[in-house]
Amino acid sequence: MIKLYSDSDGLIAVTSDKTVRLDLTLDALFQSPDPGALLRQKLVDAPAATIPTRGRAPLQSQEIWAAGVTYFRSMSARKEESKKAGGDTFYDRVYQAERPELFFKATPHRVAGPGEAVKIRRDSKWNVPEPELTLAINSQGKIFGYTVGNDMSSRDIEGENPLYLPQAKVYDRSAALGPALL
């Protein structure tokens, strides 16, 4: 397994036997048709390094997209929360649809990295962190890695009206990633 850390100087790879600085960008990795092969090639003769004490989120120019209502318990909770607004049947249509509920979450400059605080909306009374398995998908649609994510949600805003989802989910520092891409 290779762990990739990002810092102000670029990428650091940690394998079972070494820690090295890579001559590689995350953008190049995400654009590669075979990120694993590119990474293994760049590991050869790479200079030694140390794991950063203050890393960055493992993304460069990539957008974060998320999938909503991914399990039954989530659907049930959302239905209950939006019942007063008449939105309880809305989630039946989302959960049973052919197309998944995908939504835009953040651009890189709006993402909290390791050790950085996420933010909450001032106009919300019920803000919830949602731990996520975050997939790294290259430009050809191949999953080549994963990291830990945090998807902050203003549940009272979403519950008021399901169409308020962007307001409940998309704001500065509403997402966090890292510390490493595996």
Where are these regions (language model features)?
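N-terminal cap/recognition module
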Residues: 15-42
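Active-site microenvironments in enzyme catalytic cores
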Residues: 37-182
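N-terminal basic/disordered segments at the start of proteins
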Residues: 1-16
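Short, mixed charged/polar active-site loops
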Residues: 11, 19, 143
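Short non-domain terminal segments
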Residues: 9, 28, 101-102
